[in-house]
């Protein structure tokens, strides 16, 4: 499983020119922006990674709806 801290460590290892705090701030900024975009019902498209969007789902045996995040991966994600 990839956690936020794992991601920060890997990016920091790859980019030695940035401090770990700078990498953490950058990752936090990106994740906050993605989170806010989904809250505003915006579709997020990251080429060669996938699309994120909000879908409405109906509760079973109820007339109420809820929002859920939908992910669609690209066809070439696992191709070499």
Swiss-Prot record:
The keyword DNA-binding applies. InterPro entries: Hist_DNA-bd (IPR000119), IHF-like_DNA-bd_dom_sf (IPR010992). SMART domains: BHL. The keyword DNA-binding applies. GO terms for biological process: chromosome condensation. GO terms for cellular component: cytosol. GO terms for molecular function: DNA binding; structural constituent of chromatin. Keywords: DNA condensation, DNA-binding. Belongs to the bacterial histone-like protein family. Histone-like DNA-binding protein which is capable of wrapping DNA to stabilize it, and thus to prevent its denaturation under extreme environmental conditions. This is DNA-binding protein HU-like.
């Amino acid at each position: 499983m990839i956690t936020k801290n794992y991601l920060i460590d890997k990016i920091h290892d790859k980019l030695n020119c940035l401090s770990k705090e700078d990498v953490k701030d950058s990752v936090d900024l990106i994740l906050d922006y993605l989170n806010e975009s989904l809250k505003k019902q915006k579709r997020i498209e990251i080429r060669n990674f996938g699309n994120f969007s909000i879908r409405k789902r109906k509760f079973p045996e109820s007339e109420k709806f809820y929002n859920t995040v939908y992910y669609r991966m690209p066809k070439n994600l696992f191709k070499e």
